[in-house]
Amino acid sequence: EGWRESGGKRYYIKNGAPLVGWHYVKCNGSTYYYYFDKDGAQVKDLFAHFGKSYMKKKMVVNVNRPNHTVDMLLYNSKTKKYDIPAKSFVTTTPEENAHFKTGSYKLTYRRRWWSFTNPDSKKTSYYQYATRVQGTYGALIHSSRYTAKSVKALAWKTYNNLGANRSYYCIRVQCGNAKLIYDCVGYQGSGKVLCKFSNSKTKGPNGKVTIANSGGKVKAGTKMDPTDPAAKK
């Protein structure tokens, strides 16, 4: 009975059988509305499974610093809560505690490429699919670092460091996930997608997500983020 992991998939066993379809299930102290496929495996990416219509749904992007996990939760009109786990992924958060201000914000403007010059090192870096977290001092959600404005200029070490406190103000995620957030905001318009910064040690609906369970680290010298849609062409 309860949650089971098998072959990289996650199931919920009730009365000796895995749940199928939509179900309210408890995880890490909260109840969420999960979707399980016909074989009973939890569908961990509702956007990929159900298509673009899900990118237009009311949602909150929860950024959890202690667990280095982003949980995208959809609004449930029946419970009046953001309790539908759409996707969870690994993140790098700011090094300084003061640069990560907890609270509720909105995602506003977007940039296909964002450049940032570190005030300490004076080094300029480039990031793909950047979305501004309005209300924070300077945070954006974007890809890992690039050494030039090119999809083939990935700073592979920063990709491999996903899942730590290593950024200045921003929230770094895999390129494919940065684009997902960027696209959701594109569909919904500025200020419609909510974002929450949390310092809670409680894990979310999919637990702690790491680079190890997100495709693993890339080889030294890798030039493209493996999750980048451009890498799949």
Q: Where do the model's predicted regions map?
A:
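Well-ordered beta-strand positions in beta-sheet-rich domains
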Residues: 3, 10, 22, 33, ...
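Exported/periplasmic cell-wall-interacting domains
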Residues: 114-233
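Gly/Pro-biased beta-strand-loop elements
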Residues: 50-152
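Conserved hydrophobic/aromatic positions in well-ordered beta-strands
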Residues: 11, 34, 71-73, 131, ...
